[in-house]
Amino acid sequence: MEIIFYHPTFNTAWWVNALEKALPHARVREWKVGDNNPADYALVWQPPVEMLAGRRLKAVFALGAGVDAILSKLNAHPEMLDASIPLFRLEDTGMGLQMQEYAVSQVLHWFRRFDDYQALKNQALWKPLPEYTREEFSVGIMGAGVLGAKVAESLQAWGFPLRCWSRSRKSWPGVESYVGREELHAFLNQTRVLINLLPNTAQTVGIINSELLDQLPDGAYVLNLARGVHVQEADLLAALDSGKLKGAMLDVFSQEPLPQESPLWRHPRVAMTPHIAAVTRPAEAIDYISRTITQLEKGEPVTGQVDRARGY
């Protein structure tokens, strides 16, 4: 079995060695320009067109949970990968726990009014504030995939009312499920904290805009953990300035790194992190990839395959 590997920033030697240990019958090599030798599987991130074009691969693994970048490239270069070759994304591989940590810590930060207390501290004001109740602090999750399910599961333990919005109906215990555009308003109008975990598709680009934000209760919060292109940043800032939104926590941006001139840097009610909410953990990724390749070789059912038409 031949496996080719390409990632512009990962420690390639470590990955090659770890994959060969996990798959003793495989030969793993770093792909370099001019390498047209046969391969059965390709593990990639931001691959050049020539790496995949014309190859008779059994499968391709994108080395991340998000596949919007590689799908965009495949759409621009359809000769790059035959539609019959399955494309897989990393399923969880430690990202679920990281998303849980991030979401729970931020929801609790807002719920306990730590943002307000930080503002008071900056003014040297000693002023206890009224507490919020859980009943008024409904959390709504846009995007009900693997990571959305993990976040909902972690928040359940804290007793917040939970709801999700997705393409298909979910039957998660303790979570109200809303489906499609026709139920979006009902989902939004009782959501105090909006968590975005949607995939990046043509239908979701710019979805967090003034029209959507206006449907949230006054004083709502937005937590974006998905993609920066989901948010119309000017609309978000306008909602913050008007008081419609009380705060926003952003891990992703339409342009990364975020330009120095962006007003998001200086807005007092915007907090941010540099796209670190959930990163690929190599050991967990190796385990998922090696297990999935073994299942494919045996003809067994697998999970994590991308629906290229849907975009996730």
Swiss-Prot record:
Its main location: cytoplasm. InterPro entries: D-isomer_DH_NAD-bd, GhrA_Enterobacterales, NAD(P)-bd_dom_sf. Belongs to the D-isomer specific 2-hydroxyacid dehydrogenase family. GhrA subfamily. This is Glyoxylate/hydroxypyruvate reductase A. The active site is at residues 227, 275. One of its GO terms (molecular function) is glyoxylate reductase (NADPH) activity. It comes from Salmonella enteritidis PT4 (strain P125109). Pfam families: 2-Hacid_dh_C. The lineage of its organism: Bacteria, Pseudomonadati, Pseudomonadota, Gammaproteobacteria, Enterobacterales. It comes from the Bacteria. Its EC number is 1.1.1.79, 1.1.1.81. Catalyzes the NADPH-dependent reduction of glyoxylate and hydroxypyruvate into glycolate and glycerate, respectively. It is found in: Cytoplasm. SUPFAM superfamilies: NAD(P)-binding Rossmann-fold domains. It catalyses: glycolate + NADP(+) = glyoxylate + NADPH + H(+); (R)-glycerate + NAD(+) = 3-hydroxypyruvate + NADH + H(+); (R)-glycerate + NADP(+) = 3-hydroxypyruvate + NADPH + H(+). Disulfide bonds: none annotated. Keywords: Cytoplasm, NAD, NADP, Oxidoreductase. Signal peptide: none annotated. Transmembrane segments: none annotated. It is an enzyme of class 1 (oxidoreductase). GO terms for cellular component: cytoplasm.
